């Protein structure tokens, strides 16, 4: 008789955890400082903030350290932490014109009011590995002259508003009575309204948002936008003062905002009934500095507005059910769990069917013999 | 004799519609568009009766609204006006445009059967031919495999489907066989009305003749009422005692088939008759 | 650092409301705003959210995975619940008040003061025949389950048998078709007219549903192809010699189907102690 395990292994699980700790620090050396991760892994931290949907660079940095740099696992930790924190109040809507910009470009017009601000961007860099970084020390670092991060600190008119003034861009359909959906507190049922779709998208996994957006751009969908504006900067977080009921700024968050100009369509003004041709808008907004995700999100926002979906990317259920990192990695990983019982049940079926087949085959051959 | 089905002032508009085309007797134009708002008038002011056991023909060119009428009766196309009275529901004569979802499915599944020109509309290509027909009985709460299978096989023999092909998937059937399976599917729950939407449209002539022959013998044998839609007046003449001629979404002429074909009143009907029968 | 039973109180209350609704409409999947937990989605977060929302300080908890109290998933969940609540944990089915399970119902019959919480990966029984949520919602609303019976018919037609193995669909209270999580067919009859309450949680798919005590639960079947549980005739557990429990096959050099052991480890242990 072969090896027969009686029970699963609680001890083994505890040992596995110790082993993980060993691997995390296996080469000895100085443990990474959380503050270093936070400061020097800026874009990675931003990804975790965005997918974890909790604006805390510090918590994200700890999570990243704990998970040996696995961003998916780290953002999972952040989301789980988020579930333990009570919601004490809501921030009130802010206008993104109020953003303190560190970067702002437009691909639709060369000369825009306040100009194009390239800011910190690798868009034009050569993708060459800089081997000298291997020998970088705190003394050899040559920090560039300190920039004032908030170069533009007064409201800057948006390119889409410029188009709106000319009647060329759809106005947002605002219903002041309607509260935005909250996908962390309300069940998701399809069809989802736009505010809920945008929330699913902005929490979506970087790579998944990118892949779906790319598919639309390549022809599995019909959105091929011109970017009105990419804005990176800090937005104020405002709440209503609990006593005075007046807006108070309590902090700021870095975000990337993208407005895409998409194909034009015939629209009827709901109030005047006038018909006109107007561009449609695709909107992307993500926590942190992540331009490709925000652009892809703007494509998906537009694609999911399709009234009669013809491609998977225009299908709400297809895109929004499969874009979340927590749901996809969790379910894929669960395949590693024991499935002994259900597999035993499947074995029972396949053997029973095979036995039945054999019976029929034997019957048939016996009949033949009789003949 | 009381009618099985009475259609009154049926209207279907594609587009936004306006007061004129949404109202009774909209202004006619040179085509099936509303001359005021440009919406498509798929059908309007369509009124007719169907009697138990009769085969009624609807003829007209493509875009005349004949298939729309079938879709409205089968409750798959939402209408913009009118009523459809049906006499065989347990609750008596009912306007079937106003029934709840469950009654709607009972009507579609048990009381009516439909055969489409395009087999992809009528058959589920992911299950066997036999499963397609069995589905209708299963939906009607039959739960005995052997009993269902026997009934399906009998019907397959009646529509002359070769027994070696019962378990095949629709994709492997010829066009004629697909229509035979659709006919079996329409018949399985002994409906009181069968809707035939150009059932022999895409078939070659010899197969077409066999299928028409089958439909004719079934209608006599089972005494089931049928509405047959076709652009081909020959097909209609073969099967139908009464005929309706449609153009631009409206009924322009109706009557006994022999009368309409021998003595067409409308210019359009005359063209239709003379262009197809020499 | 963390609240009792991890989740904040408002979230727990919200989940309890969904549980109440689920009990009121047996077999109906109540959508809820599922939270992310320190356990992966797909690893029992639905069951865990129900357990965390219901658990009180006096509860005696049993968590088991595939019948095994010591299996990885069960150990994980148990440690988390214990860490955040400090409740007493047992492997004894009889003395537990709140039981959370992955894919098994205990061999020992549960009583009216026990609640069994089941972890559900795929709550939608119609997903096998329809991939779209909006369409399955309509099918449930209209009790339009014809497609599911067609699946059974096609099974018999092509294979001579119903091929559904675990996660066997059942009709609850003669109204809603319900997925059985995948428990094996062996456990399905235990749902019918049971003394205890069954709660089902699907975290990733964000649904909660329930079978209240003394509710009719009927496995889907055709009249002449009746529902049948797994066949373990002429087989027995290698440890406790039981012939009346769900057995897991143990691959061995002697060949397939030779050695079996109880899937329910508590049941097996008690049998051996007797």
Describe the function of each predicted region.
Chain B
Residues 83-106:
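ABC ATPase NBD Q-loop/coupling interface
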Residues 236-238:
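A short, surface-exposed alpha-helical micro-motif characterized by mixed small hydrophobic
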Residues 26-28, 146-164:
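Conserved ABC ATPase "signature" region
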Residues 254-255:
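ABC ATPase "signature
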Residues 169-173, 177:
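Conserved ABC ATPase signature
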Residues 74:
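Helix-to-loop junction immediately C-terminal to a conserved catalytic motif
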């Amino acid at each position: 008789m072969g090896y027969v395990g009686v029970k699963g292994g609680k001890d083994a699980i505890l040992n596995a955890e110790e082993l993980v700790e060993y691997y995390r620090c296996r080469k000895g050396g100085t443990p990474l400082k959380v503050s270093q991760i936070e400061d020097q892994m800026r874009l990675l931290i931003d990804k975790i903030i965005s997918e974890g949907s909790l604006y805390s660079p510090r918590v994200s940095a700890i999570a990243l350290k704990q998970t040996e740099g696995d961003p998916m696992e780290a953002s999972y930790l952040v989301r789980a932490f988020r579930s333990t924190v009570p919601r004490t109040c809501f921030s009130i809507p802010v206008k993104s014109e109020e953003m303190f910009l560190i970067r702002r470009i437009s691909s639709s017009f060369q000369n825009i009011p306040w100009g194009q601000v390239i800011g910190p961007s690798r868009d034009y860099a050569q993708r060459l590995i800089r081997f000298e970084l291997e020998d970088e020390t705190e003394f050899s670092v040559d920090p560039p002259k300190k920039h004032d991060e908030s170069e533009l600190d007064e409201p800057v008119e948006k390119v889409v508003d410029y188009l709106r003034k000319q009647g060329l861009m759809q106005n947002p359909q605002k219903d002041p009575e309607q509260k935005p959906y909250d996908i962390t507190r309300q069940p998701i049922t399809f069809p989802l309204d736009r505010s809920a779709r945008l929330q699913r998208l902005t929490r979506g996994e970087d790579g998944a948002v990118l892949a779906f957006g790319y598919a639309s751009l390549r022809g599995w969908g019909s959105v091929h936008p011109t970017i009105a504006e990419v804005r990176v900067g800090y937005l104020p977080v405002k709440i209503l003062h609990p006593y005075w009921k007046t807006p108070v700024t309590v902090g700021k968050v870095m975000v990337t905002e993208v407005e895409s100009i998409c194909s034009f369509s015939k629209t009827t003004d709901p109030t005047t009934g006038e018909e006109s041709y107007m561009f449609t808008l695709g909107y992307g907004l993500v926590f942190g500095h992540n331009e490709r995700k925000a652009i892809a999100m703007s494509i998906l926002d537009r694609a999911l507005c399709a009234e009669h979906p013809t491609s998977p990317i225009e299908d709400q259920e297809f895109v929004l059910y499969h874009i979340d990192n927590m749901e996809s990695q969790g379910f894929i990983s669960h395949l590693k769990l024991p499935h002994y019982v259900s597999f035993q049940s499947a074995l029972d079926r396949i053997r029973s069917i095979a036995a039945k087949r054999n019976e029929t085959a034997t019957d048939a051959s016996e009949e033949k013999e009789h003949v | 004799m009381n009618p099985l089905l009475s259609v009154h002032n049926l209207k279907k508009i594609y587009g936004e519609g306006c007061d004129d085309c949404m109202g009774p007797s909209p202004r006619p134009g040179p085509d099936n568009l509303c001359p005021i708002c440009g919406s498509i008038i798929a059908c309007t002011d369509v009124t007719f009766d169907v009697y138990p056991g009769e085969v009624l023909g609807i003829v007209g060119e493509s875009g005349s609204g004949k298939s729309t009428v079938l879709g409205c009766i089968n409750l798959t196309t939402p209408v913009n006006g009118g009523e459809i009275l049906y006499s065989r529901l347990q609750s008596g004569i009912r306007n079937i445009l106003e029934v709840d979802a469950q009654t709607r499915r009972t009507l579609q599944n048990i009381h009516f059967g439909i055969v489409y020109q395009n087999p992809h509309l009528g058959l589920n290509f992911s299950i066997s031919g036999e499963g397609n027909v069995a589905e209708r009985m299963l939906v009607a709460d039959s739960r005995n495999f052997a009993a269902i299978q026997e009934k399906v096989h009998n019907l397959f023999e009646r529509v002359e489907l070769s027994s070696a092909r019962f378990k095949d998937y629709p994709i492997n059937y010829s066009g004629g066989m697909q229509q035979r399976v659709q006919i079996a599917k329409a018949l399985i729950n002994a409906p009181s009305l069968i809707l035939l939407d150009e059932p022999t449209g895409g078939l070659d002539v010899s197969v077409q003749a066999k299928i028409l022959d089958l439909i004719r013998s079934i209608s006599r044998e089972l005494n089931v009422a049928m509405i047959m839609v076709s652009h081909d007046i020959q097909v209609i003449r073969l099967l139908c005692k009464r005929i309706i001629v449609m153009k631009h979404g409206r009924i322009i002429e109706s009557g006994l088939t022999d009368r309409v074909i021998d003595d067409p009143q409308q210019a359009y009907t005359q063209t239709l008759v003379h262009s197809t029968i020499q | 650092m963390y609240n009792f039973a991890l989740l904040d109180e408002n979230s727990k209350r919200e989940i309890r409301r969904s549980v109440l609704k689920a009990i009121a409409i047996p077999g109906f999947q109540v959508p809820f705003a599922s939270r992310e937990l320190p356990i992966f989605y797909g690893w029992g977060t639905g069951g865990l959210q129900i357990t965390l929302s219901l658990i009180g300080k006096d509860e005696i908890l049993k968590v088991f995975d595939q019948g095994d109290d010591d299996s990885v998933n069960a150990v994980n969940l148990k440690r988390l619940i214990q860490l955040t609540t400090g409740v007493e944990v047992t492997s004894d089915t009889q003395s537990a008040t709140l039981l959370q399970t992955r894919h098994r119902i205990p061999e020992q019959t549960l009583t009216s003061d026990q609640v069994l919480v089941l972890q559900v990966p795929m709550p939608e029984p119609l997903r096998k025949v329809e991939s779209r949520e909006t369409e399955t919602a309509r099918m449930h609303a209209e009790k339009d389950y014809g497609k599911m019976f067609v699946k059974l018919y096609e099974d018999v037609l092509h294979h001579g048998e119903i091929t559904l193995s675990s996660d066997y669909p059942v009709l609850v209270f003669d109204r809603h078709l319900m997925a059985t999580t995948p428990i094996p067919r062996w456990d399905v009859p235990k749902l019918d007219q049971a003394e205890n309450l069954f709660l089902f949680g699907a975290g990733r798919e964000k649904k909660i549903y329930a079978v209240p005590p003394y509710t009719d639960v009927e496995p889907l079947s055709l009249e002449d192809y009746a529902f049948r549980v797994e066949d373990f005739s002429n087989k027995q557990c290698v440890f406790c010699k039981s012939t009346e429990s769900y057995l897991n096959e143990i691959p061995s050099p002697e060949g397939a189907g030779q050695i079996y052991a109880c899937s329910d480890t508590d049941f097996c242990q008690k049998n051996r102690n007797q």
